[in-house]
Amino acid sequence: MSEPLVAERRLAVVGAGPRGVMLLERILARLEGAAPDAHPRRLRIDVVDPYPPGPGRVWRTDQSELYLMNTPAFFPTACAADNPGLRPSTAAQTFDQWRRVHPEASLGVRRRQYPARAVYG
């Protein structure tokens, strides 16, 4: 017996910086949580960015530490916060959790201070 045809879906993510990576993480978390009996679908994801995946242009790690984020350290995150309506994150920590574990890497920034963009990258 032949296998049923599986429809392929395509998705283009423009930007492989923190937002693009966060979007990919949420898609993967959703797919991991899909019911096993759900119709199998193939998903092709194309990521488009002139820079390598990771910090992107804005969050480059080689820029001056004088360039600050426009939000305090407790606000930005690369993973979904605990929220009953969301699937658990596949990422390990929020930025705030990370900076508490790695004070030397986060330049000792405190919860309500504005970290350098390079630190977030």
Feature roles, as predicted:
Residues 48-121:
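Glycine-rich active-site loop/strand segments that organize a redox cofactor
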